[in-house]
Amino acid sequence: MNSMSENFKIRVIVGLILFIVAVVALYTFDGIPLKIMYGFFAVVAAIELLSFHKKKRTIYNIVLSLIELSLLVASTFFVSGASRIVIWYIIFGVPGYDIFAYFSGKLLGGKIFKKSRPFPKISKNKTWEGTIIGLLISFAMVTIFYLVRGEITTEWIYLFLPVLALVGDLFESYLKRKFNVKDSNEIVIKNKFFEKLEIIVGGSNGHGGFLDRIDSVAFATSVMLLITKIVV
């Protein structure tokens, strides 16, 4: 088995384990364990972000870092006060997009649109196949969940989560490009405990660090926090 196939298998296993852990945590003690877990991820991601400055430090990059840090803080605030229903919207709309975009990109990338890339200047690895399929499937999941709920409320705003997930992912890719960082796992904390956690969340073998794991969630939930303050 080649390294790509092995990494793909690891990604599947890690994804399933994290999903099971998240669901169990969501339905234990009113979801407090899940919110604590996300808060921990956000803190470590923030530390990773701060260490970007060892690569390239400019005023523009500092501003970008402050924006990303603000997103991490805002998203933690949003998730900490979110209900189980909202958490499910987030799971379907954000990690849902990330997962299906990744797998469809790996399996079908380049087979339909060949060498054409949707965002070549920001993320060369993203494919049209992965982006489109990821958006369609995650949007379908969020829409079905919304229709099954059958409530005509402000929950319709969560239908935009897949698009926000894509934008958040692109922003983090742009951030790494500006800092000349190929992957977030280049700048992880040099500590055995955190190194093991990096492996657990898929932060080795080119999968990125903690920031890669929650970049889409941070952006999407921050925007949701702003929208809910305006709409609700």
What are these regions (language model features)?
Residues 8-25, 38:
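The first (N-terminal) embedded transmembrane alpha-helix
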Residues 1-16, 47-220:
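Interhelical loop and helix-boundary elements at the membrane-water interface
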Residues 1, 30-33, 42, 59:
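Disordered, low-complexity tails and leader-like regions
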Residues 226-232:
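Juxtamembrane boundary at the C-terminal end of a transmembrane helix
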Residues 21-35, 52:
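Short, hydrophobic transmembrane alpha-helix segments
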